[in-house]
Amino acid sequence: MSIIKEFKEFAVKGNVMDLAVGVIIGGAFSKIVDSVVKDLIMPVIGVLTGGLDFSNKFILLGTIPPSFKGNPDSFKDLQAAGVAAFGYGSFITVAINFVILAFIIFLMVKFINKLRKPAEAAPAATPEDVLLLREIRDSLKQR
């Protein structure tokens, strides 16, 4: 069997196609979750914490070079200049994204599992000794 034919058989299997569709939808869905967190949740958290902007929360690990022309309070400006900084605000935002995404996926899986009907178990085959005993019983009844 040629390698191309094997690959074709592999690629058209149901699980591979389902996985591809899932990855594409997941990528699009993560953008929605990013927007929800960045544009809806984080501003509310910022208001509740007194106008705190998490995207600019960082700890400076290095020194700012004298040639730096950006805003020393801007994490993005410091990153662009190559200054070492620990951006914990960005991490908090990503962690919230993850928790929301994981919770939504959990709810989706739970809903799908609820929709699935449990497969009815096939009746167990009657053991051979029971069949033999039934034959003996039936033959005794006929006498």
From Swiss-Prot:
Bilayer disposition of the protein: Multi-pass membrane protein
Keywords, in A-Z order: Cell inner membrane, Cell membrane, Ion channel, Ion transport, Membrane, Transmembrane, Transmembrane helix, Transport
Main subcellular localisation: membrane
Top-rank taxon, per record: Bacteria
GO terms of molecular function: mechanosensitive monoatomic ion channel activity
Keyword Membrane: yes
A Pfam short name: MscL
Subcellular location: Cell inner membrane
GO cellular component, one term: plasma membrane
Record note on quaternary structure: Homopentamer.
Family statement drawn from the similarity comment of this UniProt entry: Belongs to the MscL family.
Name of this protein: Large-conductance mechanosensitive channel
Encoding gene, per UniProt annotation: mscL
